[in-house]
């Protein structure tokens, strides 16, 4: 490791020791941050996998039920049932700070005013069968899970990026900056000791 190109003076030695102390403290803080991010990241990956499996399973089941329910209806009538959607939702995003990483928090709110005017679904109960009503309701209930999945996946992506950045900073301090400072400090201490010995020898020669 190449040492820093500085003059071997006591002032430089003091400055370098302060820099080393700061770098060592920063290294510990960054390692702690990386470890905590990794712990949360693993938890989120687990949640992501469980959510995805649940959603895919429920969507597949709902689609199967919907196809069966649709089979008993006239195709033109089914198209008319969904021609005018009335289910409206408001989506907004907040930002949450997790270990200095800004991640999204999705919120959804149903706008029930129009639904109350025209009925719960975009079609009439009188025109559809109960199986179709049931599958549509189940699909609506999946909305929050889908938003949570999107939230978790985006959070995982942002955390992964920050973990990589933090890892590079930790490695930079651990394998480059701190060793370089330590080697330079050692070099200056040796030079100062040599200068002190040389000065002592000169004094002894003068007094002898």
UniProtKB/Swiss-Prot annotation:
What residue range is the signal peptide?
none
GO terms (molecular function) for this protein are: ATP binding; proton-transporting ATP synthase activity, rotational mechanism; proton-transporting ATPase activity, rotational mechanism
Record's keyword terms, sorted? ATP synthesis, Hydrogen ion transport, Ion transport, Transport
Give the UniProt record's GO annotations in the biological process aspect: proton motive force-driven plasma membrane ATP synthesis
Q: Does the keyword rRNA-binding apply?
A: no
**Superkingdom per UniProt:** Bacteria
Query: Is the keyword Transport assigned to this protein?
Result: yes
Its biological function? Produces ATP from ADP in the presence of a proton gradient across the membrane.
Q: Of which family is this protein a member?
A: Belongs to the V-ATPase D subunit family.
The name this protein goes by in its record: V-type ATP synthase subunit D
Source species of the chain:
Streptococcus pyogenes serotype M5 (strain Manfredo)
Q: Top-down, what is the taxonomic lineage of the species of origin?
A: Bacteria, Bacillati, Bacillota, Bacilli, Lactobacillales
């Amino acid at each position: 490791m190449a040492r820093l190109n500085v003059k071997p003076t006591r002032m430089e030695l003091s400055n370098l020791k302060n820099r080393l102390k700061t770098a060592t403290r920063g290294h510990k803080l960054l390692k702690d941050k990386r470890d905590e991010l990794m712990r949360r990241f693993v938890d989120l990956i687990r949640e992501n996998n469980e959510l995805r499996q649940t959603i895919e399973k429920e969507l597949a089941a709902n689609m199967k039920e919907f196809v069966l329910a649709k089979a008993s209806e006239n195709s033109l009538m089914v198209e008319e049932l969904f021609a005018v959607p009335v289910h409206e939702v408001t989506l907004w995003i907040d930002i949450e700070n997790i270990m200095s990483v800004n991640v999204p928090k999705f919120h959804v709110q149903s706008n029930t005013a129009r639904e109350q005017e025209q009925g719960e679904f975009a079609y009439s109960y009188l025109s559809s069968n109960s199986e179709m009503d049931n599958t549509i309701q189940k699909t609506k209930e999946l909305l929050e899970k889908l938003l949570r999945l999107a939230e978790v996946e985006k959070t995982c992506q942002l955390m992964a990026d920050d973990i990589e950045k933090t890892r590079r900073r930790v490695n930079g301090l651990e394998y480059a900056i701190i060793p370089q400072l330590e080697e330079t400090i050692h070099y200056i201490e040796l030079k100062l000791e040599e200068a002190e010995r040389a000065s002592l020898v000169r004094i002894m020669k003068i007094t002898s």
